[in-house]
Regions:
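Surface-exposed, charged secondary-structure patches
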Residues: 2-75, 124-142
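Short beta-strand edge/turn micro-motifs at domain boundaries
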Residues: 51-62, 75-128
């Protein structure tokens, strides 16, 4: 199912160079990126899967097929996401242009997928910290 998501990401990615400049060993490219809003897609998938898993009687369902169908539906009805991104390049020791990368560039290319992923992992981390603190307080009180 992840392959399906990343294929849709690649298929729907459009990058239009708006402006570029070169100054010695540095270059800047301003681009307009259009892709699907993967942060929204992932949020919708998570919400819909939670409902499916929590619905009584769904335990016998082939959840992989349900998951795949939800992904197809979300991709089919996804909103576009547009962003203006600046790519900075520098020449390496061999004279080849290399991307001076940062996470924001990758997130723009991925339609917000990385930001969604990081937020979910951060929330999970805080949820675990809260749970551990509550367990510690309960143990201390007993």
């Amino acid at each position: 199912n992840n392959v399906k998501l990343f294929k849709a990401m690649a298929k729907n990615l459009k990058c239009e160079i708006v402006e570029s400049s070169e100054n010695g060993n540095e270059a800047t490219v301003k681009a307009h990126i259009t892709t699907l809003d993967f942060a929204k897609i992932m949020s919708n998938i998570s919400s819909r899967l939670m409902v499916e898993y929590m619905t009584p009687g769904n335990s016998g369902k082939d959840m992989d097929k349900v998951f795949s169908g939800i992904i197809d539906d979300e991709i089919k009805h996804a909103d576009k996401k547009e962003s203006d991104t600046v790519f900075n390049f520098v020449k390496d020791k061999k004279g080849n242009w290399t991307l001076d990368s940062n996470v924001a560039i990758y997130d723009d290319i991925c339609g917000g997928y990385l930001q969604y992923y990081f937020q979910q992992n951060t929330l999970g981390k805080y949820a675990n910290e809260i749970k551990e603190k509550q367990q510690s307080e309960t143990t201390t009180q007993n």
